[in-house]
Swiss-Prot record:
Gene (UniProt): fbp
Positions annotated to bind Mg(2+) 2: 126, 129, 287
Paired cysteines (S-S): none
Protein species of origin: Brucella suis biovar 1 (strain 1330)
Positions with a binding annotation for Mg(2+) 1: 107, 126, 128
Keywords: Carbohydrate metabolism, Cytoplasm, Hydrolase, Magnesium, Metal-binding
Chief location bin: cytoplasm
Major enzyme class: hydrolase
Cellular component GO terms held in the UniProt record: cytosol
Enzyme Commission code: 3.1.3.11
The reaction(s) this protein catalyses: beta-D-fructose 1,6-bisphosphate + H2O = beta-D-fructose 6-phosphate + phosphate
UniProt xrefs under InterPro entries: FBPase_C_dom, FBPase_class-1, FBPase_N, FBPtase, Fructose_bisphosphatase_AS
Name this protein carries in UniProt: Fructose-1,6-bisphosphatase class 1
Residues where substrate binds: 215
Subcellular localization, as worded in the UniProt entry: Cytoplasm
Length: 340
């Protein structure tokens, strides 16, 4: 008896045998019209989604073809690179160059990769966020920013010059969250058609939250203000906050972003007293910037603890930054602890 064969999806009560929702490609075509920069942006996003579809196919196979977490090198900051890090980098670079972008900045390369000389947009990307989760069944993702390529150093522009930003979350479904400056849109990959179909438009963060996302094991290394905020939250309804809080920490910024965009919350990965963490750990250009862009479009906020992320002018390609993002009200409350 064959235990498994070609899978046909389980059909639930109320399921349709056809997906009628608009595709992301069709949405982008309508948004772009005949505008050259918008067309270039749309083509770049389509290339990323094509890469995401191919990447998730490899993720789903786990260790069957080989070890995706095999160490193969280090990047410019001496972070260990896994086989799947390098493979996903090569995949997205190839597709983005074919899409006609001017240049690509990837976490896995020291310098930007040159693309089309007369390209109109530049793409900053973390090809595989959370690669420490490879092989564990925990969240992984791809996150990107698209900038106009009308300046000499497109990746050293402040985040408020982003044309578009987004992420793909590889979880129990393959979900896209993106914005072209007209609100946040969610879409899900249909493995049957190979297309991302829109599931929600104009996504907004709630006005209040009781969910926090941070690494509690480093609490003792945080600033006095941050420790006071955490302590007050953990006192729950018996403390000064007057309500109970939950904690979530997925170990991948994309995973936490996707959860917060749907359920609300406040994420913080800030600078602390540990060596190498003085300025935070996330990358400003291709992690903090796209998250901040999406948070703003959803009615939330993102700061480095004092400055809006989108106002910061990067000094280097792989500059690190502290990051706090999520529900605006809670971020404002946290800000009060920084000045106490």
């Amino acid at each position: 008896m064959t235990l498994v064969g070609n899978f046909s999806p389980l059909v639930l009560v109320g399921d349709s045998d056809r997906v009628e929702a608009e595709t992301v490609g069709a949405y982008l075509d309508g948004w772009a019209g005949h505008d050259k920069v918008r067309l270039a942006t749309a083509n770049a996003i389509k290339a990323i989604l094509s890469g995401a579809g191919r990447l998730v196919g490899r993720i789903a196979r786990g260790y069957l073809p080989g070890d995706p977490g095999k160490l193969v090198g280090v990047n410019s900051d001496q972070d260990q690179q896994k086989s799947i890090d390098v493979g996903s980098h090569n995949l997205f670079v190839e597709l983005l160059i074919a899409a006609g972008v001017a240049s690509i900045l990837s976490e896995e390369a020291d310098l930007p990769v040159a693309g089309k000389a007369d390209g109109l947009v530049a793409v900053a990307i973390d090809p595989l966020d959370g690669s420490g989760n490879v092989g564990l069944g925990a969240p992984l993702g791809t996150i990107f920013s698209i900038f106009p390529a009308d300046v000499e150093e497109p990746f050293l522009q402040p985040g408020n010059r982003q044309i578009a930003a987004g992420y793909v979350s590889y979880g129990n479904s393959v979900d896209l969250g993106f914005s072209v400056g007209e609100g946040v849109i969610f879409a899900t990959l249909d493995p049957v058609s190979g297309q991302f179909h829109i599931t929600r438009r104009n996504v907004k963060l709630p006005e209040r939250t009781s969910d926090l996302a941070f690494n509690a094991s480093v609490q003792r290394h945080l600033s006095a203000g941050m420790q006071a905020y955490v302590n007050d939250a953990f006192l729950g309804k018996d403390g000064p906050r007057g309500r109970n809080f939950n904690m979530r920490w997925l170990g991948a910024a994309v995973g936490d972003m996707h959860r917060i965009m749907q359920r609300g919350g406040l994420f913080f990965y800030v600078n602390d007293s540990r060596p190498g963490y003085e300025k935070g750990r996330l990358r400003l250009v291709y992690e903090a910037n796209p998250i901040a862009f999406l948070a703003r479009e959803a009615g939330g906020k993102a700061t480095d603890g004092s400055r809006p992320i989108l106002d910061i002018v990067p000094q280097t390609y792989h500059e690190r930054s502290a990051l706090v993002f999520g529900v605006a009200e809670e971020l404002d409350i946290l800000g009060e602890y920084f000045v106490k």
